[in-house]
């Protein structure tokens, strides 16, 4: 047993230049630090990220986005409650913080306050045991950590993550034909830089969005997908969902951002705006449909799935459009991974609901959506018990913290979504996974297409 001696929280900046919480935790024998991320496209049921708007700290940072209130809660409420506690009692500590908060969404202390401490506790315990973080996390659930996740690399950004004309939020590639994680990174490297070359040749910019993917002003989703397919081919790989040299495509459409609850329709808002403003090049797409009912949206996805090597779609419908998700699962669930994000917000309560409604076959796991390591692990376990895949995910406002890389390996989740091959806040996670693969040596396993245990 080693007791918690000190916890010090303070404000630092995330990848968007907004404040976030950093915690430094010291025990009798070890030290650790943790930083928490922040999302832009968020589900309404997420645990609350406490910001300073409406408090005495409101003017400290732009838009009242400071987190000094959360920092104070760590230093003045959480630390006194945890001082002297055994750092290896992860779940007991997490439950105590949740009880201290006493609200369903952690709105009193802030999910950002609780999570920062929760992660620091795990890191300190691992450091004290002198074992890698992934090995320590695996032992929390009596597991053996060996599986490197297949990365979903967000190479084109749109939606809330970029100031461009693309409505779907993320266009990703998955190196399914690789034999190791390092080879997956090599494949991604070739495709990413080939895509940059193709975009430049077509007269598009290669500026990047929040998650490091390119953010060109393309006209349609189909045009965007065509660029991806061509980049995969020209890089020397096969745009396919299985087989040798296969590189598949994944989408995060973030459809809650496109939904109107009054009309119950989905609208490609950026596309419509470009048409209304008569932006050059959009006139030839004037007759293209951009507004859909839920059923029409399902059909639209079907056309994309038939034409392109799409293996995964996240948030295909609005977080409250359960019927839309159910229809997607019924029609395409055997051959396409259908991931719930805003639908379930890493919350076991909503994951259970999604399982009962047969709405998805994969859960996106974001540690700050639920706000503690214990609850995150419960979400992963519930997902895997239902033969669904837990996809470990970053947020658009990230930090240099690499906790999620270790988490993916610890629970053999098989998939990770942590941005493109640019921006250090994204690359840090990939570099950590490369290090883990090296440490595991012959024990390391990269499953590629077989990671989709939820598909036939």
Swiss-Prot record:
Its EC number is 4.2.1.11. It is found in: Cytoplasm; Secreted; Cell surface. Mg(2+) binds at residues 252, 314, 341. Coiled coil: none annotated. Its cofactor is Mg(2+). InterPro entries: Enolase, Enolase-like_C_sf, Enolase-like_N, Enolase_C, Enolase_N. It catalyses: (2R)-2-phosphoglycerate = phosphoenolpyruvate + H2O. One of its GO terms (molecular function) is magnesium ion binding. GO terms for cellular component: cell surface; extracellular region; phosphopyruvate hydratase complex. Binds a second Mg(2+) ion via substrate during catalysis. Pathway: Carbohydrate degradation; glycolysis; pyruvate from D-glyceraldehyde 3-phosphate: step 4/5. (2R)-2-phosphoglycerate binds at residues 169, 366, 395-396, 417. Belongs to the enolase family. PANTHER family: ENOLASE. Catalyzes the reversible conversion of 2-phosphoglycerate (2-PG) into phosphoenolpyruvate (PEP). It is essential for the degradation of carbohydrates via glycolysis. This is Enolase. It comes from Metamycoplasma arthritidis (strain 158L3-1) (Mycoplasma arthritidis).
């Amino acid at each position: 047993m080693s007791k918690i001696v000190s916890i010090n929280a303070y404000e630092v900046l995330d990848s968007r230049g907004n404040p976030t919480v950093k915690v430094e935790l010291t025990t009798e024998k070890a030290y650790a630090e943790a930083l928490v991320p922040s999302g832009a496209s968020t589900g309404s049921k997420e645990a609350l990220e406490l910001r300073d708007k409406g408090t005495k700290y409101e003017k400290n940072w732009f838009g009242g986005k400071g987190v000094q209130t959360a920092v104070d809660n760590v230093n003045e409420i959480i630390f006194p409650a945890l001082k002297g506690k055994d750092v290896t009692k992860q779940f007991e500590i997490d439950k105590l913080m949740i009880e201290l908060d006493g609200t369903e969404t952690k709105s009193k202390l802030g999910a950002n306050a609780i999570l920062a401490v929760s992660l620091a506790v795990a890191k300190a315990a691992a450091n004290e045991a002198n074992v890698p973080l992934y090995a320590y996390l695996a032992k929390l659930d009596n597991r053996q950590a060996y599986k490197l996740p297949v990365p979903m690399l967000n190479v084109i950004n749109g939606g809330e993550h970029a100031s461009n004309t693309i409505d779907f939020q993320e266009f990703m590639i998955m190196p399914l034909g690789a034999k190791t994680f390092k080879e997956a990174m090599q494949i991604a490297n070739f495709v990413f830089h080939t895509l940059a070359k193709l975009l430049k040749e077509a007269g598009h910019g290669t500026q990047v969005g929040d998650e490091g993917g390119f953010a060109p002003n393309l006209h349609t989703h189909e045009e965007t997908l065509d660029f991806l397919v061509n980049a995969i081919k020209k890089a020397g790989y096969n745009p396919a969902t299985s087989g040798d040299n296969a590189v598949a495509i994944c989408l995060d459409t973030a459809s809650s951002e496109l939904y109107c609850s009054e009309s119950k329709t989905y609208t490609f808002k950026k596309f419509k705006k470009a048409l209304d403003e008569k932006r050059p090049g959009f006139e030839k797409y004037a007759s293209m449909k951009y507004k859909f009912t839920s059923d029409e949206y399902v059909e639209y996805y079907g056309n994309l799935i038939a034409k392109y090597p799409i293996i995964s779609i996240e948030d295909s419908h609005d977080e409250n459009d359960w019927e839309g998700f159910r229809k997607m699962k019924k029609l395409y669930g055997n051959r396409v991974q259908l991931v719930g994000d805003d639908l379930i917000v890493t919350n076991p309560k909503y994951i259970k609901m999604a399982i009962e409604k047969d709405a998805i076959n994969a859960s996106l796991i974001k540690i700050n959506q639920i706000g503690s390591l214990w609850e995150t692990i419960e979400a992963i376990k519930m997902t895997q018990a239902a033969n669904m895949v837990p996809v470990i995910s970053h947020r658009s406002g990230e930090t240099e913290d690499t906790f999620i890389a270790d988490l993916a390996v610890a629970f053999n989740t098989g998939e990770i979504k942590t941005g493109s091959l640019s921006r250090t806040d994204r690359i840090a996670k990939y570099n950590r996974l490369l290090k883990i693969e090296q440490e595991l040596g012959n024990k390391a396993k990269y499953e590629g297409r077989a990671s989709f245990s939820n598909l036939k």
